[in-house]
Amino acid sequence: MARTNESSPYVEFDRKQWRTLRKSTPLVLTEDELYGLRGLGEQIDLEEVAEVYLPLARLIHLQVAARQRLFAATATFLGEKHPDRQVPFVIGVAGSVAVGKSTTARVLQALLARWDHHPRVDLVTTDGFLYPTRELQRRGIMHRKGFPESYDRRKLLRFVTEVKSGAEEVAAPVYSHTSYDIIPGQYHLIRQPDILIIEGLNVLQTGPRLMVSDLFDFSIYVDARIEDIEAWYIQRFLALRNTSFADPNAHFHHYSGLSDRDATIAAKEIWNSINHPNLVENILPTRPRATLVLRKDADHTINRLRLRKL
């Protein structure tokens, strides 16, 4: 049985308990497909997909159906002509740099798109809503890139609002990790999806005004010990020397020739000055707002989950 406390808004599961909630949901991903979804350094395998992500996909599928019935009931009450109009179900995925939230979002997108009732599932990262480098420099916050103030939060809120309101086409800016900047004139076009997944560091933040998190129907926080996340970040940084950083046009190309020792020192400096403060000050405090917390162990495997019941 899952652990529950009548005074707590959460139900806690270990992986063995959670996997039973898959029921008869079929495994629809192949190893080759999973390879294409797996992020650098991630260890996710088909067993984890079956035991963690399939129950999650089933839960979200049930919630999508329930939410559509609720919207239809409200539309009928208001006397709208098309009470069966589908309203996009919006999912937020949050967590630290290097914790694996991008892989979580991609795997979830692939699984949810296999359901007949919601085949159109779009994924947008909040990187595209960072201010361009020139604007960050103008504001004197280039060193705060990734912190809440480095994002055009009004633009992100307007984007999600338009998608959820049923706009035929909404454009999301595209970010390049090679140039470390927004790509001028390039957009990811979102055309009335059944489900929209928004993935980013600070998507669960709250504030005195309407925030993008207020528009989420379901939210996930990918969690791990801070010491483990730091180790993963350093490992990823070292690996990037031979991949993204090796591109002569890459913003971080100057790191590609560093020795293991010097690259580790550089990664730790970035972690200590940017990623760790952002995690502790801004990202981690939003964890209690998540509908579901996925807790990873040091080997990247998800073995504990916490589901909000209220």
Swiss-Prot record:
The keyword ATP-binding applies. It is found in: Cytoplasm. CDD domains: PanK (cd02025). Transmembrane segments: none annotated. The keyword ATP-binding applies. Pathway: Cofactor biosynthesis; coenzyme A biosynthesis; CoA from (R)-pantothenate: step 1/5. It comes from the Bacteria. SUPFAM superfamilies: P-loop containing nucleoside triphosphate hydrolases. GO terms for biological process: coenzyme A biosynthetic process. Its EC number is 2.7.1.33. ATP binds at G95, S96, V97, A98, V99, G100, K101, S102. InterPro entries: P-loop_NTPase, PanK, PRK/URK. Keywords: ATP-binding, Coenzyme A biosynthesis, Cytoplasm, Kinase, Nucleotide-binding, Transferase. One of its GO terms (molecular function) is ATP binding. It catalyses: (R)-pantothenate + ATP = (R)-4'-phosphopantothenate + ADP + H(+). GO terms for cellular component: cytoplasm. Gene3D superfamilies: P-loop containing nucleotide triphosphate hydrolases. NCBIfam families: panK_bact. Belongs to the prokaryotic pantothenate kinase family. HAMAP family: Pantothen_kinase_1. This is Pantothenate kinase. It comes from Rhodococcus erythropolis (strain PR4 / NBRC 100887).
